[in-house]
Amino acid sequence: NVDHCFQKAGFDKKRLFYTQGDYGLFQCSESCCQETFDNEAVVLEMLNRQKDMKIPTELVPVCPHCGKPLTMNLRSDDKFVEDEGWHRAAERYQNFLRTRANEKILFLELGVGYNTPVIIKYPFWQMTAKNPNATYACVNNGQAVCPPEIRHKSICINDDISNVINECINRKQCNI
């Protein structure tokens, strides 16, 4: 949910965990501090003042602590910043999983690739294997797979997400 699509669709922010980061936040490119910075106003200013695919130098954001450039808060290397908000969301997520350890649950994976499989994909597989009431579902064009151990309780749809959603909408409208 780095792009806030769940929030735009009406989901409560407190029910989301941006484990991979957030396009709406900057962080120090050197991760000198475990702090993130809202970037909407700065990004809008950049858009308004850009010319010939360039922005004015004074709009390049810098860390208020060390003066290094700020960058998007995205998990792409070992410099990813996990701020206080990230840790609060992680705790809410872990609590959600703990309180539903053996309940009926769907681990739904939409478009998760192999950039950082240890963050979402592998834990979903492990939790599905461990919970007899769990189902794993993956929609991913070209990468909808699961391990043999959970194949009997998995749904892997190897197609573009928009096609799958449109098909679901069409079936609902046709009462299928």
What are these regions (language model features)?
Residues 2-176:
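Conserved catalytic alpha/beta core of Sir2/sirtuin-type deacylases, generalized to analogous enzyme cores
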